[in-house]
Amino acid sequence: MMRLVIILIVLLLISFSAY
């Protein structure tokens, strides 16, 4: 369960930095 949350946060950070 925790891994899914971490993956989602990482994806959000990547999308923000790409933005």
Swiss-Prot record:
Induction: The sibC sRNA prevents the toxic effects of IbsC overproduction, either by destabilizing the transcript and/or preventing its translation. Expression of the proteinaceous toxin is controlled by antisense sRNA SibC. The keyword Metal-binding does not apply. GO terms for biological process: programmed cell death. Keywords: Toxin-antitoxin system. It holds the Pfam family Ibs_toxin. InterPro entries: Toxin_Ibs (IPR025881). Disruption phenotype: None seen. An isbC overproducing strain cannot be made in the absence of the sibC gene. The keyword Transit peptide does not apply. Part of the SIBc repeat region (formerly known as QUAD1c), encoded on the opposite strand from the sibC (formerly known as rygC) RNA. Belongs to the Ibs toxic protein family. Toxic component of a type I toxin-antitoxin (TA) system. Overexpression causes cessation of growth and rapid membrane depolarization. Overexpression induces stress-response, the psp phage shock and a number of membrane protein genes. This is Small toxic protein IbsC. It comes from Escherichia coli (strain K12).
